[in-house]
Amino acid sequence: VLACTMAVFTYAQKSDGIVYWSYEAGYHFDFDLDGKIDLTVPTQTKDVPIAEVFVYDANGDGYFDLCEVDRSCAADQLIHWRFYYNDGNNNFIDPQDVVYGMAVGDKALSADFNGDGAGDVAIRRDNEYGLWWLMHFMAMAPDVNLAFGISDNDYLLAGDMNNDGQADVVLYDRGNWLCSFTPSTTEYKTPDFANQDIANMQFGTKNDIPLLLDFNGDGYDDMAICSVNDEEVSVNLRDPATKPENNGYSKSGRGSFDKTFYMPSGLKPTCVRGVKLSKGGTGLS
């Protein structure tokens, strides 16, 4: 497993960090959002090109793990989800390969959707039957097979938008946002897409990379957009006091640019993710 390089600093804030990734450059973590790189980890899968990554706690131990999406397998033409688990010191070990979804055409999303501490995988298949979701859960739960989306251009995101400890499905299409909160009171706590809890709201443009992170430590993920050309990240904070719509995310149909900060200079990420540090778990001393 490939090693990482790190800076030494003291982490003392409650907000999430951000990771900027590209296949060639690997993962660049900015834990305290000061525009400086705190940890560098190479892309773990080196034998094949990786299409995208997800960074979250996929085994319930409190440390962020890596999930690298491999669409290159010509033999079975399926998506191979390659999980690498953090040992607590940012060494990524015990790789696990999950095969789910078609390599060509299916959109990919990975998160803990039912709050059981295990990472789950989901694909969305856009065809004549609609914007169709298929979800597979690592633990005992019935799979999801339901339609939900804005358009076939949707960018798939997952974040805790209602502070219940499990990931909700969030979609972004050229500045438009849509979200359905995962029910946390049902037996299996799996997405049912019955409600559009965030819908018809605007924040960002078609040129931005969307991401979700809890910027202010209130337990709710906030919406953010990364402008790679400007090397900036702008955040729309959840604030029910000033944003009465969409469960505290918009006013008059729009989010607001509440916070803007710089990303580390010189990076050209193709994927940007928020990183939760539930144990203060940067792995740094």
Predicted regions and their residues:
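Bacterial N-terminal signal peptides
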Residues: 1-7
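Sec/Tat signal peptide C-region and signal peptidase I cleavage site
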Residues: 8-12
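Trp/Gly-enriched beta-strand/coil motifs that build multi-repeat beta-propeller-like domains
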Residues: 13-285
